Amino acid sequence: MSPVDRLREALPDAARDVRLNLQAVLQGGALTEGQRWGVAVASAAAARQPALLSAVLAEARSRGLDSAAEDGLAAAALMAMNNVYYRFRHMVGKPGYTEMPARLRMGRLAQPATSRADLELFSLAASAINGCEACVRTHEDVVVKGGIGEEAVHDAVRIAAVIHAAAVALEAGEVAGGHEAVSAA
């Protein structure tokens, strides 16, 4: 049984739909396997649930998708920074802030382990989880202009939504005492 399958089985009964959706979104669709698992890694990292991230990373690496996994982790880390910064600028709405340079390093965007479009796709998923409208719009535009179609973008956001739901369900199950923490081993 794969790490993600073990994790799915550990989801509480209240999250039966999440269990089924987790299986469905990680198979097929408009994304390549690398894109699918890069999005899953970025989403799991953004969702901040250690057992989930461990399982998704182990699964991606077992499939030989180390570059996608690394870019997924990089995207989540960059978006943890950028989503806070750009969400602030968007929420405040003062021109003075939007005219100031961010001065935040984002060198990984220029040198991804996969491709620029894929890293942007992973960033889009993390930004959707983090709730940064400005970042979601920007990444979606770059991704589509980079040749990734809207159906693939839709699939990526579906993965992000289900991964986030799995993180919530795992945390709720742990708090409710119904399940012990899950390991990827």
Curated annotation (Swiss-Prot):
The active site is at 132 (proton donor), 135 (cysteine sulfenic acid (-soh) intermediate). Keywords: Antioxidant, Disulfide bond, Oxidoreductase, Peroxidase, Redox-active center. Signal peptide: none annotated. Its EC number is 1.11.1.28. It catalyses: N(6)-[(R)-dihydrolipoyl]-L-lysyl-[lipoyl-carrier protein] + a hydroperoxide = N(6)-[(R)-lipoyl]-L-lysyl-[lipoyl-carrier protein] + an alcohol + H2O. Disulfide bonds join 132-135. It holds the Pfam family CMD. InterPro entries: AhpD, AhpD-like, AhpD_core, CMD-like. One of its GO terms (biological process) is response to oxidative stress. GO terms for molecular function: alkyl hydroperoxide reductase activity; disulfide oxidoreductase activity; hydroperoxide reductase activity; peroxiredoxin activity. HAMAP family: AhpD. This is Alkyl hydroperoxide reductase AhpD. It comes from Anaeromyxobacter sp. (strain Fw109-5). The lineage of its organism: Bacteria, Pseudomonadati, Myxococcota, Myxococcia, Myxococcales.
